[in-house]
């Protein structure tokens, strides 16, 4: 199954439905994904670089199907909750300094969490904005692969983080 849709919400809804069907391999081509990135694999979802030429795209799919591709495999079970939550806070629009002040921790601790997450996800060498977008996509794929109860828990967690950031901005 190959999914290449510009709208992120629509892409994630379709991806969630496709993942329920137990498809062998899913190839995802996100819109705002750099063309120089490697191929990433999380569960049975392969994330390929954006705007590949057709023959290169077909070769990539063939090599992934035959397990010959140099794919960065991601095991989200090895990622701590604090690393995911730091990423979610930063994706909500708060800066490192503001988040450190809000959580009463140091900026160095937060940067360490983000760097550890980037290393575990194979996103070393990219700017922070790109790393956060990629981490968010990996987090969404991770949550889509969970049962409905856990998925609802993760959605509530995201909403709670967003609300706490909004409340903090209202106070400050």
Language-model features: where?
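Helix-turn-helix DNA-binding segment
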Residues: 72-113
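Residues within the DNA-recognition helix of helix-turn-helix
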Residues: 60, 113-116
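A broadly tuned preference for mixed-charge, low-complexity surface segments
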Residues: 50-61, 78-84, 140-148
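N-terminal regulatory/sensing modules of transcriptional regulators
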Residues: 1-69
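Basic, Lys/Arg-enriched C-terminal extension of HTH/homeodomain DNA-binding domains
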Residues: 119-172
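Charged, solvent-exposed alpha-helical segments that act as regulatory interaction surfaces
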Residues: 67-74, 123
């Amino acid at each position: 199954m190959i999914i290449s849709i510009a709208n992120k919400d629509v892409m994630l809804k379709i991806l969630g439905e496709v993942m329920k069907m137990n498809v062998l391999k899913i190839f995802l081509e996100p819109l705002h994904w750099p063309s120089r990135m490697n191929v990433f694999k999380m569960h049975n979802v392969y994330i390929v670089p954006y705007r590949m030429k057709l023959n290169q795209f077909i070769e990539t799919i063939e090599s992934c199907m035959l397990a010959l591709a140099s794919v960065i495999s991601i095991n989200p079970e090895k990622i701590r909750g604090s690393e995911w939550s730091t990423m979610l806070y930063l994706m909500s629009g708060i800066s490192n300094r503001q988040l450190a002040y809000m959580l009463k921790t140091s900026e160095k601790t937060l940067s360490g969490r983000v760097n550890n997450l980037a290393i575990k996800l194979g996103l070393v060498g990219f700017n922070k904005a790109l790393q956060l977008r990629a981490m968010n996509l990996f987090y969404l794929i991770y949550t889509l692969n969970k049962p409905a109860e856990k998925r609802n828990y993760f959605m509530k967690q995201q909403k709670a983080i967003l609300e706490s950031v909004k409340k903090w901005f209202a106070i400050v």
